[in-house]
Amino acid sequence: MESNRDEAERCVRIAKAAIEAGDKEKAKRFLSKAERLYPSSEARALLQAFEKNDTAGNGPQSAKMAKGTEQPKAEKDSNASASSDTGKGHTQDQLDGVQRIKKCKTYYEVLGVSTDAGEEDLKKAYRKLALKFHPDKNHAPGATEAFKKIGNAYAVLSNPEKRKQYDLTGSEDQMQNNHRNGGFDYHRGFEADITPEDLFNMFFGGGFPSGSVHTFSNGRARYSHHQHHHHSGHDREDERADGGFSMFIQLMPIIVLILVSLLSQFMVSNPPYSLYPRSGQATKRVTENLQIAYYVSKDFQSEYSGILLQKLEKNIEEDYVANVRNNCWRERQQRSDLMHAAKVYRDERLKVKAESISMENCKELNRLTSLFRGG
C-alpha cells in the first residue's frame, strides 16, 4: 500500500498540472487512477468538483475549467469504467450483507452492537465488518458505500464526544431529512474525522503520508522531516506500472487476514486504563510527567505502584501524544485540501471554511513539544 500511495500522490500532482493547463480529460483520467491506487480526500474532492461542473452544463465555471469544448469520449470512458466495477463477481451473501448495511438506521445497527457497547466491542465489530466489506474483497454493488458507512459508524461511536452528541440527536434518518439526494451521506450531520481507508490502514497496517511530524521517545522530543520524492516519466510508463500495483492489491486481503489471526491472540484482555471515562474505568488520575488525564478501575492502586506505575504512565503519555499527533495530521490535511480546492475553483466559502478549522490538536502538539524542549 505504501508504493500505491506514492504513485497516487504523483497522479494527483499530474492532474493538478493538467487542470492549470486546461486539459480536463487528462486531469480526470489521472484523478480516477489516483483513487483506484490509494483513495484520498484531495482526489475525491477534485473529482466531485468535475462532476458538479459537468452537471452545470456550459456555465462560466464549467467553461473555465475545460477551457474549450467537452470531449464526449471522456464521458464514455468514465461510464465504461463504472460499469466494469459493478460487473465484477460477487456472492449472494456479499450482496445480502450490503443490503443489510443500507437498511440500517443507526450506527449501532451498522456495527451490530448494543447502545452500551464498550471500546473493545466496537473494535471487534469494526474489524470483522471492514474485512468483509472492503472494496478489494467485496465487489457487490454498493459495497464501497457500505464500507464507508461502517468506517463512519466506528469513527463516530469510538469518539466519546461525537457519540454523546449522536445519542442525543438520534438515527440517520433525522440527520438526512434536509438533504435527500439518495445513497449514504458522509459529508453532513455526524462527520468522521478520518477517511474509511485511513481508518482501515490504522487497524490493519499502513502509515500516514510523509511530511513534518513530531515523534516522542524516552521522554524527549525529536523532530523529523520526510521529503516527498518527485518522479518523472511519460503517461505510457505510468500505465504499465499499474499491473504490479493491481497484483499487490489483490494479495493484500490475504496478508491482512493472516496478520489479524496472529495479532488477535494478543488483543483479548482490556488495557488497565482509558484516555476517556467508560464503564468500569471511571476513576480519574493524571500522569506525573505531562499531567495527562486517564481513567482506571477502583482496584487500580492495589495493582500498580512504584516502577510498574511509572512504566504504565509512560505508555499512557506515548498513547496520548500519538493520538494528538495523528489528529493534528488530519487537521492539517483537511485545511490543506480545502485551501487547494478554494484556490483551484476560486471558491471563497471553501477558503473561509479552511481558515475556521481550530487546529486544537496541533496547538496541543506544539505545547507538548515546547514542554519537552524546556520552553
Curated annotation (Swiss-Prot):
Residue ranges of the region described as Disordered: 48-95
Cytoplasmic compartment spans: 1-242
Domain J, first and last residues per copy: 106-170
Membrane topology term: Single-pass membrane protein
Keyword RNA-binding in annotation: no
InterPro entries (alphabetical): DnaJ_domain, DnaJ_domain_CS, DnaJ_subfamily_B/C, DUF1977_DnaJ-like, J_dom_sf
GO cellular component: endoplasmic reticulum; endoplasmic reticulum membrane
Subcellular location: Endoplasmic reticulum membrane
Membrane-traversing stretches: 243-263
Annotated function: Acts as a co-chaperone with HSPA8/Hsc70; required to promote protein folding and trafficking, prevent aggregation of client proteins, and promote unfolded proteins to endoplasmic reticulum-associated degradation (ERAD) pathway. Acts by determining hspa8/Hsc70's ATPase and polypeptide-binding activities. Can also act independently of hspa8/Hsc70: together with dnajb12, acts as a chaperone that promotes maturation of potassium channels by stabilizing nascent channel subunits and assembling them into tetramers.
Name of the protein described by the UniProt record: DnaJ homolog subfamily B member 14
Organism for this UniProt entry: Xenopus tropicalis (Western clawed frog)
